[in-house]
Each structure stands twice: as C-alpha cells, then as structure tokens.
From Swiss-Prot:
Pathway: Lipid metabolism; polyunsaturated fatty acid biosynthesis. This is Omega-3 fatty acid desaturase, chloroplastic. GO terms for molecular function: oxidoreductase activity, acting on paired donors, with oxidation of a pair of donors resulting in the reduction of molecular oxygen to two molecules of water. Chloroplast omega-3 fatty acid desaturase introduces the third double bond in the biosynthesis of 16:3 and 18:3 fatty acids, important constituents of plant membranes. It is thought to use ferredoxin as an electron donor and to act on fatty acids esterified to galactolipids, sulfolipids and phosphatidylglycerol.
Amino acid sequence: FKFRQSPSSPRFRLNSRNWALNVTTPLTVDSSSSPPIEEEPKTQRFDPGAPPPFNLADIRAAIPKHCWVKNPWKSMSYVVRELAIVFALAAGAAYLNNWLVWPLYWIAQGTMFWALFVLGHDCGHGSFSNDPRLNSVVGHLLHSSILVPYHGWRISHRTHHQNHGHVENDESWHPMSEKIYKSLDKPTRFFRFTLPLVMLAYPFYLWARSPGKKGSHYHPDSDLFLPKERNDVLTSTACWTAMAVLLVCLNFVMGPMQMLKLYVIPYWINVMWLDFVTYLHHHGHEDKLPWYRGKEWSYLRGGLTTLDRDYGLINNIHHDIGTHVIHHLFPQIPHYHLVEATEAAKPVLGKYYREPDKSGPLPLHLLGILAKSIKEDHFVSDEGDVVYYEADPNLYGEIKVTAE
C-alpha cells in the first residue's frame, strides 16, 4: 500500500490495485509505535482521550487466526436465507392482504431489507469473500435492490473507516464544527436534530452528503471519488437506475397502493434501522467520547471511539453489526467471527472497550439513549485536537419558534 492524497480533498486515501483491501489495516503492524501494555492505577480516573497503552499489533495478536478466515459458502448461505425470507414475507402479506397483517409485515420486511444492506456492506469491505468479483456481483444485487449505489457507498464508507473519529475527515455521522453548525439554516437544523426526522436522513445523504461536505454518491466526478473509480461509480449508478425503473414498472403492474405496502414502507423502515444503528455506533455513550484532529488523530485512537451495541434478538438478524469496535479496527473479519474476535480482544482493550448495555428481546433501551444524544450532541469546538460534543442551549427554543 501507499498513501495517496485525493486531488479534491485534503484527506488521505489508501491506494491499492485491489479495492476490497482498501478498507482494512495492514497485515503487519509496527509494534514499536506504542509503549508496552501497563495496568492503569486503580486510583487514576480513566481518560478516554488519552493515547492507549497498546497498539494494533497487540489487538491483532489476541484475535484467533481462524477469525480472519472468510468462507464464501457460509457468506452465500446468509444471502440465500435472507432473500428467501424477504420473498416469503412479501408473498404471505400479499396473499393475506389484511390490515392486521400489514403493519407486522412492514416492520419485519423493513428489518430484512436492513439485513440485506449489512450483507452488501460486508461485500464492500471484502469480508464476504476473497473474490472481488463475487463481492461486487453480490453487493450490487443486494444494495441495488434497496436503492443503494453499491460502489458509490462502498467508497465513501471506505473513507469513513480510514478516518473514523476525525472531526473533518470522517464521512459518517461526523460532528459539525461550531462554525459549520452556526452556518446552517433553521430548516436544516430542524431536520438534523429532531426525531424521527433525522432517522430518515440516509437517502438525502446519498444524494448530497452531510453538512459541510460536497458531492453525491451517484456522480462519478464527486469529491468522494478518485478518477480511477469513475467506471465503478457509473456501474453502480446504472444498477440503481435499473432498479428504480423496475419499481416504476411494478407500480403500473401492481398499482401504487400495493407497491406502497409491499416495498415503499419497508424501504423507509430499513432507512430508519440504518440511521438508528449507525448513529448509535458513534454517539450516545454516558461519558462523552473524544473526536480528534491533527497530530492527536490516529487510526487506532479514532477506532476506539466507536461503540458496541446489543440489539437483543436483532443481533442475529442483522449479522452482529453491533460488534462494531473490532469491525472498525479490522473490517476484513467476517461478521460471523466478530463476537469471538471481540471477546478475545477485550483483555487488551481494557477500559477503552465499553461494554454495551444488555438488551431485552428488542433494543428498546436504545431509544432513550438516541433521544438524549440528539438533544445534547450538536457540534464540537472549531479549535483543539481533542474535542467533545457540545450542546446548543437555544436550539429547541429556536426550532419551536420556527415551527410556529
């Protein structure tokens, strides 16, 4: 690998002939860059923004070797399972066509659409298999079916992983600086910090990214992409367009009401799952977690700001995406090994790993955490290399006045 600076952005991207490996960490890590692991004195208050007393090599060494093995047959079995459930749910709901059944169908099918997204996400990381062609074909089928441009999103998600925890360079649910926050118009603030509206943000993010950033996941000349990625982006946008055309045709064949019930409402449930899960993996801990700039940022320190979450019965359905810390540090580990890899890494991570609150059958406990974070986490300081979220005390009074 070699680092190459994007001509349109100050952030750095990994340059490799194999795009699947662009979202990973080096196979060998210099273990001399950090001091040996030492036990923290019990009387010392833990500072989550302090450099950790371990490095990536220490964590990697603790993870069993078999956790890195990708089994394409096992990965494909999950695809077959999820697609079978999706079609069975749609067929059952259409056959029964009962208003007592439809709400249950919407929740179940929306959750399954989200499960399809996670499998496509694994294809984008290359953790689905070692075959880039298989990853690309399966990823396009899964993501296009739920109106996600596979390569466009894969590339922006690569940027997210390579810059996780960096105030300016992170891509997903990154904090706004106070200057950018204050430059937002009132409708944008209302949308961004009001539930449930903010949980519907994903399609708008695909079209126009986040406040303070420019470009689109659909346009090959976007700031998100390098010139060599143009054909990939065009391919995914074409697949997205083909799916959109198919949905329009089905609308004429089946009728708009049937399409609304079978696809449109589950699609938006899927969007809410996606925003809910991805937001809480980077926000909402009871103690404020740091965000970094400049020399204070490193791949390891940024990755340690992510959070694991327990989703109860949903853990298995959405492929243990809640085991997020190890996934962020080592995205090449297949999802079916993440729980074991996390357990093995915990002794090394120590207090830098934050044990998630245990969920009941459904992750209802996370709703209060989400609401609290949306209310309190608005922006970070324009200055400083280690910063924490701050709240705008006037935001909701301003929103109320605007609404009236």
